[in-house]
Structures are given as structure tokens and as C-alpha cells.
């Protein structure tokens, strides 16, 4: 399956892929460490997005949002906006 994004929910991670979503018990920091920096980047304190998972970008009320290939919206916080822009995702 192609990994598009990971979002944290309490002590779990929701893994977004081309085959749907699944909840796993893991910390976001541990998942990002295993994935490495070449595959994607953190866009928010609770979101990691794969470079190949982004279909589009949009601004909603002045806030940057990445639209995943699934249609799901991944928020981009001000803290991570420079990294998202540098990666060419916005």
C-alpha cells in the first residue's frame, strides 16, 4: 500500500494509505523516526505527510491545508509552513 499520511489520535496513529485507513498503537515521533526524512515531513504537531500523498493545497481562512489523494485534509501549522514550502508542497 502507498502511505499518504499519518495523524495522531490520543495514543494511536491513524495511517492513511491508498487502501484506506487503519489505527495502530504507536507514537508519532517513533513512526517518523522509522520512516526517515526522505519520505515526507511533519506538517503539524499531530500530522506527518508523505511527499507522494499530496494531491493539492488550499488556504482556508488564511490557514494552509494539504489535500491528500484520498481527499482528506492535513493541516499545516505556522511552525511547519517553511518546511512544507521548502519541500515544494505549497
Language-model features: locations:
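Basic, polyanion-interacting recognition surfaces, primarily
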Residues: 1-90
Amino acid at each position: 500500500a502507498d502511505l499518504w499520511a499519518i495523524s495522531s489520535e490520543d495514543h494511536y496513529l491513524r495511517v492513511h494509505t491508498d487502501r484506506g485507513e487503519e489505527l495502530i498503537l504507536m507514537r508519532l515521533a517513533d513512526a517518523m523516526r522509522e520512516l526517515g526524512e526522505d519520505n515526507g515531513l511533519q506538517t503539524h504537531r499531530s500530522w506527518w505527510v508523505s511527499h507522494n500523498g499530496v494531491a493539492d493545497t488550499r488556504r482556508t481562512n488564511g490557514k494552509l491545508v494539504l489535500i491528500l489523494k484520498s481527499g482528506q485534509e492535513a493541516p499545516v501549522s505556522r511552525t511547519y509552513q517553511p518546511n512544507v514550502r521548502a519541500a515544494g508542497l505549497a
